Amino acid sequence: MDVRNKTLWILRDYVYILIGAAITAVSFNVFLLPNKIAAGGVSGISTILQSYGFEAAYVQWIINIPLFIAGVILLGGKFGLKTLAGSVFLPLVVFLTRDIQPATHHELLAAIFGGVGIGIGIGIVYLGKGSTGGTALAAQIIHKYSGLSLGKCLAIIDGMIVVTAMIVFNIEQGLYAMLGVYVSSKTIDVVQVGFNRSKMALIITKQEQAVKEAVLQKIDRGVTKISAVGGYTDDDRPILMCVVGQTEFTKLKQIVKQIDESAFVIVADASEVLGEGFKRA
């Protein structure tokens, strides 16, 4: 990759980070903050502290900047300018849009659409290979020094924030916060992976040649033949592996059943498939 293209890719990443952070901030201000939904993360902490008179944007800056510095000191220099940009820009947009009118005062709608907005924003930030800092950095620090998995660290931090929201506000607000956390996490997955999930099929059949040719000719998908041995008989039992689009999966099942009704088929969701016939990286 030449210098010009590399520069364009870096600029694209920063555009993603800034757009994603802006979407996250606006979603926070129009859905979550006015309805007191502390849906995890630094935004959740700032929602709780806002009820005591602290400005949400200031709280986010006060937490994000020291955490970024701690991350650089304790975890090394991998937290570069992209994380700093997200950590600073998100609270800035929260501050600039603090007087925007709430989109709804219905807590359930706020939790759902706030979670969607936050998820879209954070997902776009991740597409730019960036971060908005906050509790994600705290979780990585705890992960390094406690031995707990990163997922558990994030769950513990978000869980503590939700429980605190239940104490400060009420149990119902805490439940809405849990819903917001769930919706945002699922939306992040959709933004990163997309809706077009594929299916991976592992086919064990005595008619592997016929099945392979049918898949190649009738569905126009590639097939990989994997050598395997039956655990009960110790006989060679080749496995055919193929990945098809969700709309092609029904046709695949019909083809296999027509050729070999006794075929053993294992199916799994392939959340992201790159390469010939599928989307590019």
UniProtKB/Swiss-Prot annotation:
Entry membrane topology: Multi-pass membrane protein
Phenotype of null mutants: Cells lacking this gene show no apparent growth, sporulation, or germination defect. Also shows no defect in the synthesis of the membrane-bound CccB cytochrome or any other cytochrome with covalently bound heme.
User: Cellular component per GO?
Assistant: plasma membrane
Q: Which InterPro entries match?
A: DUF2179, N-reg_PII/ATP_PRibTrfase_C, UPF0750_membrane, YitT
Superkingdom to which the source organism belongs? Bacteria
Which residue windows are transmembrane per the record?
Answer: 14-34, 56-76, 77-97, 108-128, 149-169
Its localization reads: Cell membrane
Provide this UniProt record's keywords sorted from A to Z: Cell membrane, Membrane, Transmembrane, Transmembrane helix
Main subcellular location of this protein, as a coarse class = membrane
> Which family does this protein fall into?
Belongs to the UPF0750 family.
Q: What is this protein called?
A: UPF0750 membrane protein YvjA
